[in-house]
Structure formats: C-alpha cells, structure tokens
C-alpha cells in the first residue's frame, strides 16, 4: 500500500474506483506512456515554480566572475504544485517547502531555508558558510545541510574564494615561520617549488616583518592559481570556498535547473522504454 501510494503520488499510476474496489493501473496503459505523462507534467509544474524563484533573484554582473568547481552530486529536487497558503508563511517560504529545500520534517516557525535563499538571491559575491551562519544566527551544521540541498537541486554552486588566498597565505607564512623557521618554509612549506624571486621575497618579507596581505597579493600575482592553492595547502591552510546562486540572474538559474531536470527525466524515459521492451520480449 505504501509503495502504491508513492506511485500514485508521482503520477505513474492512477486508481479507478469500482464500488468498494480500487484498481490501480498505469496511466496511459503502458510504462512509456505513464513516464511521458509524468515528464510533461513535471516540467510544466517546475517551470511555473522556477518562474517564482526567478523573480526573487537580483541580477548581478559580479556573482559569476569566478569559475565554479564541477559538481558530481546527484540531481535531486521535489516538484510540487503550489499548495494552500499557511499563516506565517510567505511566498518564498512556500516555495522552498514545495521544492524540498526545507527538508522532510521542517519544524514549525523554522525559516532557515527561506532566509538562506533570500540571502543568496541578493548576494553579489559568493558567501562562506561561516558568514551565512553569523548573519542568520544559525549553526554552521544546519546552514551546511540546507546549502547541500540547494546544491543537489542545482540552485547553488560552490566556488573557490580566490581573493582570500593572499590573506590565508600571509597568515600561514607568519605562523609557520614562528613555529618552524625559514628552512621548513623552503622545503615542506612549499616555497621551494615557486620561482626563486617569489619565494625569496616572501621569506625575506616575513623574516623582516615587512610583509602584509597586499604585499603578498602583489608577490604571488605571477603565480598560477593552481600553484597558489598548493602553496596554501602546504602552509597548513585550506582553500576557502563560498556559495552562490548558479546564475547571474533569475532566468539563468531557472534554465540551469530545467536542464538538469530534463536530463534526469530523459534517463527515466530511457529506463521505462527498456523495461517495456524487456517485458514485451523484444530484448
């Protein structure tokens, strides 16, 4: 019964009532037809809901300046038609609930998912988990959980905070020089892998106390981003990451999610066709 309820809910199966009997049948009379109906309905509903999201997103010329990392996580989004209004829940709150961004067991009065979506929709630059948790007065764990749901839905993507590298390299240099000395910096600290002029300028500046973040930025400006990230790692730091909406405007975000949904539904259609061929003995 539980599984049949799920099949009816997703639209693959419908029930015909004959007196006291409920007969469950595939919509359209076949797996391929049922899948086609589900696909058409899902894309139509999703397009409507994403148009609501697009109106929330502030266009930005700087949001997409940094290339995002490739995200291999599985696409997952809940597609639900607009439901009845709930007291204390505005349009943005209803949208995150219907898209599954608030989770399966949202607590009454919990607006974290809504607040995060609003915050990211207006952000002009990627924002770290730490900054988001401080702005919303929430734990980093809860913020990270909601961000992961948004990433799975294709709404949000993670990007390296390139502008933060000089700051973290400076902190690592000063800390490791005091703790381990110049020899360690040139060997295990990773400076020996860089051009001699670059490594010498960094070590001399750190030793004389004349180094600051802007100076580090100028010195490593000729170093590739890949080597900057390696240097940061060998100095004991970690590449800082931020999160942003996956588009410069609402239309871009909506188009990305629609592409991911269409790709997933094509896979479902392919599986249904193969299943039908198998059942009919054509394979």
Where are these regions (language model features)?
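Short acidic, hydrophobic short linear motifs in intrinsically disordered regions
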Residues: 123-135
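Basic amphipathic alpha-helical segments that dock to polyanions
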Residues: 3-7, 116, 132, 143-156
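A short, conserved structural fragment
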Residues: 8-16, 151-165
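Short amphipathic alpha-helical elements of helix-turn-helix/winged-helix folds
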Residues: 115-123
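Short alpha-helical segments that sit at the start of domains
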Residues: 69-115
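Amphipathic alpha-helical dimerization/coiled-coil segments
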Residues: 30-76, 181-283
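Short, Lys/Arg-rich nucleic-acid/phosphate-binding segment
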Residues: 17-23, 109, 160-172, 235-241
